[in-house]
Amino acid sequence: MDTFEAISSRRAIKKFDPNHKMTSEEVDSLMKLTILSPTSYNQQNWRFVTVTDQSIKEKIGIAARNQAQPVDGSLVILLCGNMSAWKDDPLRYWQNHPTEKQELVKASLEKKYSDSPQNRRDEAIRSCGFAGQTIML
């Protein structure tokens, strides 16, 4: 399936077969693809919690205004933004770049995020949004 077909054939599913269970291999494959989602400065400032335990999914269903999808779906993925990723070893994904580039990236991260909780929050929301879109495809 190409990108255009994946986008045009995507649908919002409201009813799930509560008896269907994703295999751990399917969940692992999905998450390996999800972590390829883009993030600003390659911060990878999202964290994912996969939930398959039925009792926890029921609690999530209540928190989600009693929607059936979290309860009946095989898997719930909680997307969490890490708002301190910009300072948690930010150059770990830039190791193969020249030192000058690494220094520029670090300075840019500090300038954009050090004094702005709003920027950190907005970036975490964007990054989780990209990851969510990847999951839905």
Which residue stretches match the model-derived regions?
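Acidic, surface-exposed loops and disordered segments
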Residues: 1-137
